[in-house]
Amino acid sequence: MMKLKKRTFLILMAALTATFASAQKQPLPEWQSQYAVGLNKLAPHTYVWPYADASDIEKPGGYEQSPYYMSLNGKWKFNWVKNPDNRPKDFYQPSYYTGGWADINVPGNWERQGYGTAIYVNETYEFDDKMFNFKKNPPLVPSAENEVGSYRRTFKVPAAWKGRRVVLCCEGVISFYYVWVNGKLLGYNQGSKTAAEWDITDVLSEGENVVALEVYRWSSGAYLECQDMWRLSGIERDVYLYSTPKQYIADYKVSASLDKEQYKEGIFNLEVTVEGPSATASSIAYTLKDASGKQYYRMPFTSSPVD
């Protein structure tokens, strides 16, 4: 009988230990994790704007006048809550009703549009304060007071983009956000002042599409954003779409130097990264002009597929 009690006690202790260990290993939400920098984002690259014709580059208005660029700035539907527990959980679904939501301007911080409070501090963390009953503890940030803004809007892809690649770009969102198109999670980003892009070609529908962002005021990334400035939140830079051919210039690098013997002759070097179907070569040409627009050099060349 004594052995039975001891065995029962040991089993109970083992169960409690396993439960405690399981509770201890619960993963942090992405916005609390220093490892969750981004998900499914395209690799960073130099700005490469697509045009219908090379002559369009010279036209007034720049890349925004390209037929393969679409701004998503303007009025978005918006819901704001004081903490993550109260956020609308499935607002990103196209069937979700947002008729009672307010409108908000994008780009624009939500504190500047009637939601929450802008906080100014110098070199300290704005959430390391008695007001939030929180002491800094990286990577954790206050949860009960971590405001969440839910953004939604619709868009239609131009007919001329059919059969082409389509990319969504968010130039700057503070501090952490998830993004969906037509109810499908594209990924997330935790770099407030850096652009993030996702290829949305395969999730688009003919007709109306729905894009949604769930934005958190604070994240583990906030520990890297402590400087003398106003602490604000929301979509504060441009949001847009652009379209490229299936085979496209993904990046390029220009470098200039002088010959190593006399240091008189200039050396121009251009590296171009082409992505897309690798079965065919790419025809590329570059033109070198001075500040007045005078053409000095034009060079066509062909890139070969690389395994």
PLM ranges: what are they?
Residues 86-97, 114-124, 255:
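Short, polar loop/linker segments at the starts of domains and inter-domain junctions
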Residues 89, 280-286:
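Short flexible loop/turn segments that cap and initiate beta-strands
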Residues 82-84, 90, 191, 254, ...:
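Residue-level structural signal for beta-strand termini and adjacent loop
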Residues 1-25:
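Bacterial Sec-dependent N-terminal signal peptides
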Residues 25-104:
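Hydrophobic alpha-helical membrane-insertion signals
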Residues 254-261:
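Short beta-strand segments of immunoglobulin-like
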